[in-house]
Swiss-Prot record:
Catalyzes the formation of acetyl phosphate from acetate and ATP. Can also catalyze the reverse reaction. Belongs to the acetokinase family. The active site is at 145 (proton donor/acceptor). It comes from the Bacteria. GO terms for biological process: acetate metabolic process; acetyl-CoA biosynthetic process. Disulfide bonds: none annotated. Keywords: ATP-binding, Cytoplasm, Kinase, Magnesium, Metal-binding, Nucleotide-binding, Transferase. It is found in: Cytoplasm. PROSITE patterns: ACETATE_KINASE_1, ACETATE_KINASE_2. CDD domains: ASKHA_NBD_AcK_PK. GO terms for molecular function: acetate kinase activity; ATP binding; magnesium ion binding. This is Acetate kinase. InterPro entries: Ac/propionate_kinase, Aliphatic_acid_kin_short-chain, Aliphatic_acid_kinase_CS, ATPase_NBD. The gene is ackA.
Length: 396
């Protein structure tokens, strides 16, 4: 079996896969340990039943041990050795270009990247150390959100700042959501019956965190997020791209230091900042149709910024666009967000089929009409399955 782990500073999302068929692993259990170091709660779903526990979780090691003990107690596994490998989602892998077995060199790279992802990498490090103690025989694999974007050309990843900043301090565009983009590229190769290395896509990963990526010949060619996940399109609570001078200006205006202003740009901006009310797209679209001016302002800006990047990436692909894909929480589920973005793309001659856009679906659906010059789809991403597959390939 394969365990997939996505750990934060106080939470662990986990999913267990049966890998008897290595080419088609099946997820059998999905769970969450949360409020680690505060008080603690563990919940998971197995065979249609939900299990919930309130338990003291002083650290990640105790949380993982509790999870494994419950899996044994419920006869889901007979012992920890039934799990032969663990795949970790790691947000920042520096310049590592593919999923990797975690050896000392890879682990040191993850630690070095903490300064680039201070909100995300520490949780992964803590979880890796905990699982090494609790599951000493398991093979450990790191899957990086940055790895997929290591194919960017220099003109895409460099910033117009002193070159020494890049050479000496690693200041460059890294990009994120790479595990999701990797999954979507593979899925779209199946859907369109086209070899992945010939695939040209514009993929909109729109969740609370959001980014858009231009995929050319199956590889990341450009992407919206940058050195950190703060850059690019407008998001739930993140600003996306702004004039860098705003930071110094608002430090002086509000008498706050840089870290506090950066925190506002990360946690109090985006949809939440412009509406002053909510970061949840369901609230925003609901308010929009009730005539709420604050939500109108937020949604109009969000959809315009997204459309602007799609046009920019369409230019990079020329007349060879196999499809525009919407994925992640907002992209998969928000009918009106998709519609409003597509309506802001007159140059692309896209024709939306409103009935298709509104209907429920399984893994994917077309939302463009047969007359549309470019195919448009909503596709459900599956980062955990992608991590599982990479883990199997590296450990079999």
């Amino acid at each position: 079996m394969i365990l997939v782990v996505n750990a934060g500073s106080s939470s662990i999302k986990f999913r267990l896969f049966n890998d008897l068929d290595k080419s088609n692993p099946i997820d059998i259990l999905d769970g969450l340990a949360e409020r680690i170091t505060v008080d603690g709660a563990v919940s998971f779903k197995y065979e249609g039943k939900k299990y919930e526990y309130n338990v003291e979780l002083p650290n990640h090691e105790v949380a993982i041990k509790f999870i494994l003990d419950k899996l044994i107690e419920l006869n889901i596994i007979s012992n920890v050795d039934d799990i032969n490998a663990v795949g970790f989602r790691v947000v920042h892998g520096g310049t590592i270009s593919k999923s990797s077995i975690i050896d000392q060199k890879v682990f040191d790279t993850i630690k070095d990247a903490v300064k680039l992802a201070p909100l995300h990498n520490p949780g992964a490090i803590t979880a890796i150390e905990a699982i090494e103690k609790v599951m000493p025989k398991a093979k450990l694999v790191a899957c990086f959100d940055t790895a997929y974007h290591q194919t960017l050309a220099e003109e895409q990843y460099l910033y117009a700042v002193p070159y020494s900043w890049y050479k000496e301090h690693g200041v460059r565009k890294y990009g994120f959501h790479g595990i999701s983009y990797q999954y979507i590229a593979e899925k779209m190769s199946e859907v369109l019956a086209k070899p992945k290395d010939q695939l040209n896509l514009i993929v909109c990963h729109l969740g609370n965190g959001a980014s858009i990526t231009c995929i050319k010949n199956g590889k990341s060619f450009d992407t919206t997020m940058g050195l950190t996940p703060l850059a690019g399109v407008m998001m739930g609570t993140r600003s996306g791209d702004i004039d860098p001078s705003i930071i110094e200006y608002m430090c002086k205006e509000l008498q706050l230091d840089v870290s506090k202003i950066t925190n506002i740009l990360n946690k109090e901006s985006g949809l939440l900042g412009l509406s002053g009310k909510s970061s949840d797209m369901r609230d925003v679209t609901g308010g929009y149709f009730k005539g709420d001016e604050d939500y109108k302002r937020a949604l109009n800006k969000y959809t315009q910024v997204s459309a602007d990047y799609i046009i920019r990436f369409a230019n990079l692909l020329g007349h060879n666009i196999d499809g525009i894909v919407f994925t992640a929480g907002v992209g998969e589920n928000s009918i009106h967000t998709r519609q409003f973005i597509l309506e802001k793309l007159p140059l692309l001659d896209i024709e939306i089929d409103n009935a298709k856009n509104e209907e429920s679906y399984g893994d994917y659906k077309y939302i463009s009409s047969p007359n549309s010059k470019i195919k448009v789809l909503a596709v459900r991403t599956n980062e955990e399955l992608m991590i599982c597959k990479d883990t199997i390939n590296l450990t079999k």
